[in-house]
């Protein structure tokens, strides 16, 4: 007699995959400033020399008039573009209001514009972040969510990692019932180099708590993002 294969609990087929759980991020990775004051770094002079070396590598004459100040300007631009390494996400989210006045639904801030740089080619990618969370006791000022996006965006990133870091930081500091983050962005490493396809958008999302566990809440989050009424 042929052996009978018993179905898994809940009627799932025998070859069903276990439910996926996203990897947890190490809080030390995103809750503190990435660069500490006592951390050894190259000097500004060394950084400017590195820029000069790259200019020479592509075939430029680094001594011509138009490039004399370029190394200094590039280093100053990097100081601005990557200032997120010196800023602490936890400090931004730690300034909260302790009273929700009985509010028990989620808070959504959408269309938070940002520009970041990919860690593969150090080329810009830019777009919008949409963030929702359902508070328990702590409510953060709405501008702080935009500030959080700015801090993480001003570091070398992948879009996937940026999405996960934003969600994890809110989840860890505010302890809400759930967090939803969606990012839509265009990557210049795809539009101006390589395949050279302009206008293509990449979407990433991350859900925690009630959003991860309840598809209806995910659908409502998506509906409110798309609504323009």
From Swiss-Prot:
GO terms for biological process: one-carbon metabolic process; tetrahydrobiopterin biosynthetic process; tetrahydrofolate biosynthetic process. Keywords: GTP-binding, Hydrolase, Metal-binding, Nucleotide-binding, One-carbon metabolism, Zinc. GO terms for molecular function: GTP binding; GTP cyclohydrolase I activity; zinc ion binding. Residues 1-26 are annotated as: Disordered. Signal peptide: none annotated. It comes from the Bacteria. Its EC number is 3.5.4.16. GO terms for cellular component: cytoplasm. Zn(2+) binds at residues 118, 121, 189. The keyword Zinc applies. Pfam families: GTP_cyclohydroI. Gene3D superfamilies: 1.10.286.10, 3.30.1130.10. It catalyses: GTP + H2O = 7,8-dihydroneopterin 3'-triphosphate + formate + H(+). Pathway: Cofactor biosynthesis; 7,8-dihydroneopterin triphosphate biosynthesis; 7,8-dihydroneopterin triphosphate from GTP: step 1/1. HAMAP family: FolE. Toroid-shaped homodecamer, composed of two pentamers of five dimers. Belongs to the GTP cyclohydrolase I family. This is GTP cyclohydrolase 1. The lineage of its organism: Bacteria, Pseudomonadati, Pseudomonadota, Alphaproteobacteria, Hyphomicrobiales.
């Amino acid at each position: 007699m042929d052996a009978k294969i018993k179905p898994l609990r809940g009627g799932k087929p025998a070859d069903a995959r276990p439910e996926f759980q996203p990897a947890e991020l190490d809080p030390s990775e995103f809750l503190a400033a990435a660069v500490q004051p006592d951390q050894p770094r190259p000097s500004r002079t060394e950084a400017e020399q590195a820029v000069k070396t790259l200019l020479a590598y592509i075939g430029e004459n680094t001594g011509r008039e138009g490039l004399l100040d370029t190394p200094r300007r590039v280093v100053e631009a990097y100081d601005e573009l990557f200032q997120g390494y010196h800023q602490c996400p936890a400090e931004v989210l730690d300034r909260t209001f302790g009273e929700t006045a009985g509010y028990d639904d989620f808070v959504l801030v959408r269309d938070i514009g940002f520009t970041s740089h990919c860690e593969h080619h150090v080329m810009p990618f830019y777009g919008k972040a949409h963030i929702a969370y359902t508070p328990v006791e702590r409510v953060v000022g709405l501008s702080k969510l935009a500030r959080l996006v700015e801090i993480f965006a001003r570091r070398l990133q992948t879009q996937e990692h940026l999405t996960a870091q934003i969600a994890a930081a809110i989840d860890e500091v505010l302890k809400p019932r759930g967090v939803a983050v969606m990012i839509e962005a265009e990557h210049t490493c795809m539009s101006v180099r390589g395949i050279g396809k302009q206008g293509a958008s990449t979407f990433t999302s991350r859900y925690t708590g009630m959003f991860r566990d309840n598809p209806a809440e995910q659908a409502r989050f998506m509906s409110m993002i798309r609504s323009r009424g």
